[in-house]
Amino acid sequence: MWSIGLFADYDGTLVPPEETRKAPGPPEAVDAALRELSKYIKFAVVTSKACDFVKSRIPYAHGYGCINGIEIAAGGYVAVAEDLNRELEKLSLVFKQLDVYVEEKWTSTGVLAGVTIDWRDGGKPPVLLERVLAEAESRGLFVLRYGRHPFVDIYASRRNKGDAVRILKSLLGLDYVVYLGDSENDRPAWEVADVKILVRHSYNSHIKTKGLLPIHIEELPAYLQEVLRAVAEASQ
């Protein structure tokens, strides 16, 4: 195998942001290309989702960076950040009272490490959202806001996707990493990647492309097929 790896975010990158909660995995064309690519190069998913969520949808990846870098799984090993703030669990009932979709992200060791408060269905953020976020920050939790995405993330650690990329790059024995992402939480990963790709869609037109290679999400299958052809030919 080559010493180059392809790492990608899940929500809004491999799966359109409107379909993340209901989709059983990436679109068929994307999934097929990734399955073939994983036979030639190392492929990893670096996501804000929990590992059990993404592993069930992309079981063929060589590595996973989950819950925004809090949990790493690769090569038969699993590592979870040691600095998890248990105040997140204490606030979980408060989050659920906001009357919007709340996604809890649990580590494989059974600790609540992340929460997404998502108002995509309602169109407007909850009235008490800012008060709740202020309380979370006062307790030392990491609140991650997005420019135009209709959700906010709260984490029990300040680990990030850049940490996940560095660790997975080392565990998988890679010299170079191509990283595909779409939002603010991908910036730390882009910073440490060798090739930085921004997947464009309706929620992220505000993100500047300086230093990034933009690809529209509808063009992703064709891009992956192009990469697949290149690595397949080079391996012959």
What are these regions (language model features)?
Residues F43, Y64, V177, K196-L198:
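Short, well-ordered beta-strand core segments
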Residues W2-T20, W190:
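Asp-based phosphoryl-transfer active-site loop
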